[in-house]
Amino acid sequence: MTESSIHDPLTIRRLYGRQQGHSLRPKQAELVETLLPQLEITTEQAVSATDLFGDDRPLEFEIGFGKGEHLAGQAMMRPDHGFIGCEPFLDGVVGLLTHIDNNQIKNIRLHRGDALDILEQLPDGCLDRAYLLHPDPWPKARHAKRRFMNHGPIGLIARKMKKGGEFRFGTDHPIYCHWAMMIMGQRPDFEWLAQTPRDFLQRPEDWPQTRYEKKAREKGHEVWYFRYRRV
């Protein structure tokens, strides 16, 4: 590994934090045992709309889906699209499986692990939308390279998106907000869609609220919603 690659966020594969929290309840354990194997994407398989869903439907991708509220909501709004979600933590995976089971959602596939691994497997120019909502802000300057919002990962997202596709990013952390605006402002492959401040201070109607966002609002935090078009 070269000196430059050591500092390239695409080479960072360490996951910080616990991958499992509390013990699973019987129903949750059943979902992991029976439903997860039907929906799980591995790093060894082919990953395309046809491979995952049997047809060439539009694809959307969420990086770190948390407990799955947003991904499930988007999938229910557009049942003719295919949705891929990646989340390393079992509690989050169980949350999404619960949404899928309760609502009989058929158009989601998921990966328990690093989103970059699956992004790299996708065909170039295949994604209609990509989502990065409330990622860990890593607020200390010395941890900036751990932020997903860096040129390495964003460049990979750009390569996997269709021209005219949309990348959405949300955060309630001011340091991450400013950092994201700096990174995205340096990229000629994305166009910020905001016309007025209201556009990134108010959640769009087709942007389901996450549990994390709700908690942030309850704490009195401002939340910022960014939409970018792939050009």
From Swiss-Prot:
UniProt binding sites for substrate: K140, D172, T210, R211, Y212, E213
Catalyzed reactions per annotation: guanosine(46) in tRNA + S-adenosyl-L-methionine = N(7)-methylguanosine(46) in tRNA + S-adenosyl-L-homocysteine
GO MF assignments: tRNA (guanine(46)-N7)-methyltransferase activity
Keywords assigned: Methyltransferase, S-adenosyl-L-methionine, Transferase, tRNA processing
GO CC terms in record: tRNA methyltransferase complex
Family note: Belongs to the class I-like SAM-binding methyltransferase superfamily. TrmB family.
Record protein name field: tRNA (guanine-N(7)-)-methyltransferase
Lineage, broadest ranks: Bacteria, Pseudomonadati, Pseudomonadota, Alphaproteobacteria, Sphingomonadales
Gene it is expressed from: trmB
